[in-house]
Each structure stands twice: as structure tokens, then as C-alpha cells.
Amino acid sequence: MKKCLLSVAAMLLTAPIFAGGILTNSNQSAAYMRMLARDASTSIDAVYYNPAGLTKLSDGFHFSLNNQTLFSKRTIDNGFPLLNEHKYTGDVTVPFFPGVYAAYKMDRWVFSFGFNPNSGGGTANYGKGLPSFEIPFSAIPSGLSAMGIPTTAYSVDLSFDGSSVFWGSQVGASYKFNDMISAFAGLRMINAVNTYKGDIKNVRINPVYPGINPSGNFMLATDFFTQLATLATGAATSVQPLIDGGGGALTLSQAQTAGYLTPTEVAQLAGGLGAAYNSSMTVSQVQAAYQANATASSENAAATSDQHVDVRQTGTGFTPIIGLNFSPNDKINIGIKYEFKTKLE
């Protein structure tokens, strides 16, 4: 029997952060809700959006504390044809999305500090799991049927909770060269925390297999594969005396003709291999096939057993930042900021 294609693992994806990349949050100020174009800001939230523009502030200390609470639903639509369902809906909750900004202006100089969730910031709950979890189990019925074990359906209980937040703490200094041009240089420290919790339970299938599930009722997949491994081990052991006696090179038909095996034993040995059996196989090859089946079935029993994942990832990185603010007149202000690549470790 060939292995069923099972791969049950937590999908823990890590990737380098690129400044301005798709993972970077853009709503770093409550003012963003009213005005999406904040990249040339000269208000206190310029600490994040346009730090070189902080020189437009009046002399003295400036401070801002704001928070956003966000709720949404995310739907994943997967077209894999063997899935029972193709839509997976998750509840996304972000109860605490703060922005803390402070700046002190002294003539031409401005020293600033910012703290905010640079990426992520919330949790996602998928009560029915994710398609990447379910796809391996959805392939079991077709895989077993292809091996001569009629199977038409599966079921599985899945759940997944994930959270991700990349906290950014930024410091820097801005300098005003003249009324038109100012510049900024600073550094942001990123502290990343990702958590993943999930369950895979009650993987059930309905194989029709004599001696294990002749009626084709739903049963736990791990129980089916465990019993299949036991039967395969027994079949491999049953022909060992014949091999020890020098009959390993005989086919099953030849062994029957020679009186080493009964017609019933030949039928059981051939039938147990299903589509993997052909009449030219020797007794030794039949034994090897059953041994391989026993190993594969034991692995599949483990892969379809109840599983729980609880993982926490952490990382730290540093982002150099430079900026330029250009004001050719009172009506035009242009903010430029470049964030270097961040390597998380």
C-alpha cells in the first residue's frame, strides 16, 4: 500500500521585513481615520509618518496618546476540490492598537520618540481551522480508494487562533537647515511576538475493509490505520517460515501448487495488498510490501491522531530611518522617509 499523503504541521511562516512592505501598518495615528494621506504630516504624528517635518512644530514639548479598536472578519476561499467546505471565516480582533508620540523642539532641533505596533497587532480566530490544515485529510478517501479500499468521505474537527504584533520603539533627531529643508535620522527597534494555537481532532473516515470496517461506517482514522498496521504486520510474519524454508523466490501461485500455501491463504495475501499486488510478485516481495504497509499505516495512524499546537515566536531587529522635508512655499509640503531593511533575529 502506498502512503497516504498526510502532512499535519503548524504553518509557521517567518519572513524578513521590508520597510514599506505589505506587512507594515499604515494606520499609525487616529488622525489616519480622517485623512489617509499622512506621509507629509507636520503634526505630532509626523514622529512616524514624516519625522523630518517635525521642525514645523512650535518650540516646546509635544505629546500624543491615541488608541484604535478594530474588529473585522477574514474569509479564506480555497478551491481545492476534495474539501468538504471551501470557505473559512475568521474573527479578527484588535482591542489595543496604541500610538504614543513625543517630541521636544528647541530652535532648529527636534528630538522625538514613538511607540506603536509597526505590524500586526491583533488576533485571528478560525473556528473551523484553515484549509492548509484540512487539505491533507481531504485527500485520504481518494488515496485509499486508489489503493483498493473504497472510501467516500471524511470529517475532522479543526480550530486555529493566531496573533502577531511587531512593536516598534523609535527615537531620532530632526534638524532644520532653513525654512525650506529639514532632515531626520533615527532608529527603530522592533520586538516581534507571534503566537499560534490550534487543534486537530476526531479525524474520521468511512473505509470498507473486511476484518476492520466491513459495513463502511465512519470510524476514527487513527484506529483504522492502527488496525491496518496490525494486519499487515501479521501477514508479513505469516510467510516468514516459508521464506526461511527457501520458498521466498516462489510466487503465491507456485507456493500454492507446491502445497506451502492454501488457496484461502493465497487469496488473503493477494487481497490484502489490493491494487499493489500483481501475480508475478514473489513471497519475499509480498512480505516486503506488507512490511512497507505496516510502516506507512503506523505513520498515518500517528498523523491522524488528535494533535495540539501551542507555539510562540519572538524576534528583535533594528531599522535605521532617514527623512527629508521640503517646503517650497506655504501651500506645498513634501515629506520623504526611507526605512532600511530590518533583519529579525
Regions found by a protein language model. Give the residues of each.
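Outer-membrane beta-barrel pore domains and translocons
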Residues: 66-70, 116-118, 168, 188-190, ...
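Membrane-embedded beta-strand positions of outer-membrane beta-barrel proteins
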Residues: 63-67, 113, 173, 183-185, ...
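Residue-level signature of outer-membrane beta-barrel architecture
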Residues: 55, 103-106, 171, 175, ...
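Membrane-embedded beta-strand positions in outer-membrane beta-barrel channels/transporters
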Residues: 48, 99, 170, 321-322
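Outer-membrane beta-barrel channels and translocator barrels
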Residues: 58, 106-109, 178-180, 329-331
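Extracellular/periplasm-exposed beta-strand and loop segments of Gram-negative cell-envelope proteins
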Residues: 33-36, 75-80, 84-93, 121-167, ...
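N-terminal, post-signal peptide beta-strand-biased segments of exported outer-membrane/organellar beta-barrel
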Residues: 15-126
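Gram-negative bacterial Sec-dependent N-terminal signal peptides
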Residues: 1-19
